[in-house]
């Protein structure tokens, strides 16, 4: 039996699958087109400031998934970290997600939880009974003032689309709290790897039986050299964009350095048109256990992803999902290839979900090998 496995991409998906299959006795080759592992989670020390830099933008690990949390803690020391996001709009600084402090500050009131909830309900547009767009959803639940201050312009900057063009599902879970909790996430486990994400991925992938080829693109014509291929690149690229290019948003970062503390917080969103960027990230605040005299910041801009750009956020509108379905159908007929991860399934995925799915995919492959069953092209439904 050919026990050689090819994995395309050395982000979390590829690294976790490589880890699991190598420990099960397979010989694994990982092909990574970039000069580094860890994908968009890549972190490195900034030479000038010494700050741990989230090279492709901020990543905070947060999860309720016990298996994913236990897995990452096996390969890195995690420091406690709580993401507390601020937002600038109408010339003031507010807390996000919208909470009791945000509501009271915005409206100049001193309401308690029940009063604030009733007040917010009174602001909602009751004429919208079944919201179908992002805009309708926001107007229905928070009213026009909060919608225009915090959601409308920011959404246009982030997605390049009007909120009236986006589905309501983006805002299904209304980010409003009627207390003073300013933790951006509500998950049980939250933290940051002490030595950065690339060190974590390196520890995951650095097991006997795994060889990593950096700066190397995998040729699909070589797939017959392997028992199986796990592909975490863009699904449309595997098929040479035969049905067209699946669109993404990409990010540009304007990097600047300063002495001391630039903004006093890791992330500040800019929700109105006073600034063209969506947010400023000050990286040293992601590692509060470290001390640095200087600081490095990113001003972040979102735009349509072009052919040579790094894809970040899939645009899963109706037209895009129709194109995705064509690729999914092609993938179902591709023997001995499984499509995984954010790009391989054309979905926005948090790190913990990526890791949990990679572990489940590894389990499925090992079970299929034991039972001589066919390994599917997907272990989740990318159309869901």
Regions flagged by a language model, labelled:
Residues 12-13, 35-37, 49, 101, ...:
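Short, solvent-exposed loop/turn segments at secondary-structure junctions
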Residues 22-47:
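Glycine-rich FAD pyrophosphate-binding loop
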Residues 24, 216-326, 332:
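Mid-domain catalytic core of redox enzymes
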Residues 45, 282-384:
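Conserved flavin/dinucleotide-binding core of flavoenzymes
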Residues 49-125:
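Dinucleotide-binding Rossmann-like beta1-alpha1 core, especially the glycine-rich loop
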Residues 90-228, 232, 239:
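Active-site/ligand-binding neighborhood in enzyme catalytic cores
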